[in-house]
């Protein structure tokens, strides 16, 4: 899927829209493969699932290297369209094992790759940074 299609996709493209109230959100923290902590907030906005991320340690270094501002929105991969509501998505993040997150720059977009185990199965989940 190209960036434009990803940015314009909605849950109805993948099935039922998530059951959530406007601007409903949950937060959690992950440690990246760079050993820094990242605080994530999952937000529902008009039936689209967005992920907001903020680096807790060395934020100025992160901004300098990537040229992005503090308040960026990340849209979740289609993977999460399978989940019924925000609590299910939050539960997914709190129950996964062996979390490892990495960031890469690709065509001026930041790709967040989350490698983890869910029920002993390796999963690779990617988020794309929205400008």
Residue ranges and their predicted role:
Residues 2-130:
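A structural signal for beta-rich interaction modules in eukaryotic proteins
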């Amino acid at each position: 899927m190209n960036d434009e299609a990803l940015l314009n996709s909605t849950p109805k493209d993948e099935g039922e829209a998530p059951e959530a109230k406007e601007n409903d959100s949950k937060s959690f923290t992950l440690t990246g493969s760079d050993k820094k902590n990242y605080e994530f907030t999952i937000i529902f906005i008009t039936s689209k699932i967005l992920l907001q991320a903020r680096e807790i340690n060395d934020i100025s270094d992160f901004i300098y290297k990537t040229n992005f501002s503090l308040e960026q929105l990340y849209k979740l991969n289609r993977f999460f369209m399978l989940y019924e509501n925000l609590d299910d998505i939050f539960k997914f993040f709190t129950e996964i094992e062996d979390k490892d997150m990495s960031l890469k720059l690709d065509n001026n977009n930041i790709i967040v790759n989350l490698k983890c185990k869910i029920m002993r199965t390796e999963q690779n989940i990617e988020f794309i940074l929205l400008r």
